């Protein structure tokens, strides 16, 4: 999908024998994160389009770090990311789904915007049975 849209895709990950959440939530989490990254890259008219996914574990912490190139300004209200689509009432559900999963598993989510870089970092605490 990224290749079809002229987006360079990089991935660095570890193997986890068991994720701390359900398979459907894992698909929803990564699906929404990648959909948002691809959509942001598609808006870039000039410049490099890229997405980088990193998954790493340090002791009992699991880090999901997804970064991508951007062109448009990121909208933030009350510390939350806001959709920049015209029909706001029917958009933003992907972000809400991500937040729901992060909150359900008592994770933390932060983001950074620096120039043409957007990065979202999600951290989960792993119990003794996970990974």
In which residue ranges do the predicted regions lie?
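Conserved short strand/loop->alpha-helix "switch" segment adjacent to the catalytic nucleotide/phosphoryl-transfer site
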Residues: 10-29, 89
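Short beta-strand/loop element within the Bergerat-fold HATPase_c
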Residues: 48-60
């Amino acid at each position: 999908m990224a290749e079809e849209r002229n987006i360079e895709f990089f991935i660095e990950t570890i193997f986890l024998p068991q994720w701390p959440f359900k398979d459907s939530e894992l698909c929803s989490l990564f699906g929404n994160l990648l959909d948002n990254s691809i959509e942001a890259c598609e808006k870039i008219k000039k410049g490099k389009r890229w997405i980088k996914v990193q998954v790493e574990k340090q002791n009992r912490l699991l880090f999901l770090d997804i970064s991508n190139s951007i062109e448009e300004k990121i909208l933030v209200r009350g510390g939350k990311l806001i959709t920049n689509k015209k029909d706001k009432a029917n958009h933003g559900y992907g972000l809400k789904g991500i937040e729901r999963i992060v909150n359900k598993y008592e994770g933390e989510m932060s983001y950074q915007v620096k120039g043409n870089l957007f990065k979202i970092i999600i951290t989960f605490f792993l119990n003794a049975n996970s990974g």
